[in-house]
């Protein structure tokens, strides 16, 4: 395999699970958490088998202190924005990394409160992403909406059926006080597995991985 091609593929492909130098996929708890992006995902896109996964089965209070939530998100992002090695294997490189969504659309009702506006400004700074807003009454079915990788549905109205035909993930969760849940409304997790052996001989990976 060409190291140049592998590195280019790693940097440019948009998928939830990436595999290099191996003939099959994998889905192993913690080592290779599994879950797709785009149409192969729904909700906040938390991967099955990841350290975040048990959190999705709990109920959380809606946000009451935006400042506290912003501080918690900043602290969590400072840790989870780095490549995190999922095991100590020498024969495989298994790691996970969180990537901010490039563009997020917020669908809400009229006149969101000032605290929410302040929160969105903080989110843009923390994750360096583009966040657009639109009122539910002005939302239209056209291809321009497909430029977003995630739509955050905060309107009291139900999402229309046509919205599911597009490539983005649809997140209908309310803003909650828990940062480990809330972060997945702004980022998505990628799991990467690279075989580092050839017929049992260690060190035959086509890609050099730096864990920061």
What residue spans do the PLM features occupy?
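Conserved C-terminal structural/oligomerization subdomain of aldehyde/semialdehyde dehydrogenase
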Residues: 1-212
